[in-house]
Regions:
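C-terminal structured domains
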Residues: 358-361, 365, 369-430
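A structure-centric signal for secondary-structure junctions around beta-strands
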Residues: 12-13, 426
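Second RecA-like catalytic domain
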Residues: 4, 16-339, 343-359
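Arginine/glycine-rich "motif VI" loop of SF2 helicases in the C-terminal RecA-like domain
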Residues: 6-11
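Short hydrophobic alpha-helical segments that form membrane-spanning helices or hydrophobic packing faces
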Residues: 12, 95, 212, 397-401
Length: 430
């Protein structure tokens, strides 16, 4: 701590640092500051108490905007902030408890075991090694199955803190370990991914892993109460079992069915699903057999943007002709067509929901529908699909090269007084 002295002076009551460590921090050799790496829930709640925004304050090291938003989202899940980010009465009550907001919420809403669990989660792990199972820590505090390698000093502090926290706690809320853990960490309810390895996705959207040898490795649902901080896929250091029924009962207001139509790049088709979700967790997933055609068409547009236009022969000829037209004519460049798909394509996509469907799709009617009658007449005059010889024979014009061309015998143009032109360019005769 530092005490104020005369203007420009600061008297330290603690350790005095030389400049070398600060040079080390600037060089990146020291651990990041707490505001860079720590949990920002308490900080975000304090901001809300004062009705302040982080941008209003000056920091030596400002908080990361994304991590601050995550903390505010957690506080909203805890009921400490409302939907506008303002502090609630429950949030104000949490600030009066000598605990992290997560744990304060658990003690306020949980049963008789909540103070003990809060004390365990506030202290360094009393068990050295072994399973991550939080139930083993509760047993050790209660004097049941205490392993030889227990940290007795930490255990003693946990017991003292638990007694202190229990004073004034009503304890009339849920008391199941998994539910208590989920009350504190609603963003860390973890659902096991498919596959043999114990890899999990958490309700907040991040990934987590568990040692394959841990007794909890086969559990479908866990609550991760301590993680190693890896930003890509954190390793669980403490966790509690959570039953499906307890999750549904305790968080019924946050679990709901969602309908979605999305383009699957991996499968090359539109997926229409009904999913029961808790945060990022998909608890149940079913086919949406009666998905509206409009929803499927909108999802297919993402597939079209990935695959490209894929025009057939007739559509490719039309596009080549249209792209020869000058200013004032509708834009038929591929970039423009893909950017404006919503304006011209959805109504033509009935029955199209996969890569194979799109390859077989006749694009020409959708393209020509973009033209007015006058535009169509102008196109036929300036860049016709066929050239009519003096003998009355119609010959298809090839627009695939840089210059339009036709293949015919020279005798067939006898009687023509001037060279045929296409959109201002000479028609090449081969």
């Amino acid at each position: 701590d530092a005490a104020r002295g005369p203007c420009g002076a600061c008297v330290g009551r603690g350790r005095v640092q030389t400049m070398d460590p600060w040079r080390g921090r600037r060089a990146g050799r020291l651990p990041p500051a707490e505001i860079e790496a720590g949990d920002l829930c308490a900080f975000a709640l304090e901001l809300a108490v004062w009705g302040a925004q982080a941008d209003d304050l000056k920091f030596v090291t400002p908080p990361h905007a994304g991590r601050l938003a995550e903390a505010q989202a957690v506080l909203h899940m805890l009921g400490a902030l409302d939907s506008t980010g303002r502090i609630t009465e429950h949030g104000r009550s949490l600030t009066k408890m000598p605990l992290h907001p997560r744990l304060a919420h658990m003690v306020a809403k949980g049963g008789r075991s909540a103070p003990t669990l809060a004390a365990i989660l506030s202290e360094r792990d009393p068990l050295r090694g072994g399973s991550v199972d939080l139930a083993l820590r509760l047993d050790a505090v209660a004097g049941k199955r205490v392993p030889a390698e227990v940290n007795h000093a930490a255990l003693s502090r946990i017991k003292q803190d638990a007694k202190r926290l229990a004073r004034g706690q009503t304890g009339d809320g849920p008391d199941t370990l998994g539910v208590l853990a989920a009350l504190a960490y609603p963003d860390r309810v973890a659902l096991r991914r498919k596959g043999d390895a114990p890899r999990y996705v958490m309700s907040g959207g991040k990934g987590a892993i568990l040692s394959e040898s841990d007794p909890l490795a086969g559990e479908r649902l866990l609550v991760a109460t301590d993680l190693d901080g890896d930003p890509r896929e954190a390793r669980m250091r403490q966790a509690a079992r959570l039953s499906d029924s307890d999750l549904r009962e305790s968080f019924a207001d946050q679990i709901g069915w969602h309908k979605l139509c999305v383009w699957s790049r991996r499968e090359g088709r539109v997926l229409a699903r009904q999913q029961e979700r808790f945060g990022a967790l998909v608890l149940d997933d079913r086919a949406w057999s009666d998905a509206p055609a409009e929803d499927i068409a909108q999802a297919m547009l993402d597939g079209v943007r990935q695959l490209g236009l894929m025009p057939g022969k007739a559509a490719a000829l039309f596009l080549a002709r249209a792209r020869l037209m000058g200013d004032g004519f509708p834009d038929f460049s591929e970039d423009h067509l893909l950017e404006t798909l919503e304006d011209w394509l959805p109504g033509h996509l009935a029955g199209v929901r996969s890569t194979a469907d799109w390859k077989a799709f006749d694009l020409l009617p959708a393209l020509t529908a973009r033209l007015s009658w006058d535009d169509q007449q102008a196109l036929d005059r300036a860049a016709p699909a066929h050239f009519t010889t003096p003998l009355g024979r119609k010959i298809a014009i090839d627009y695939s090269e840089t210059q339009p061309q036709i293949a015919l015998r020279l005798q067939e143009v006898f009687g023509t007084t001037r060279h045929p032109m296409i959109a201002g360019q000479p028609l090449q005769i081969t």
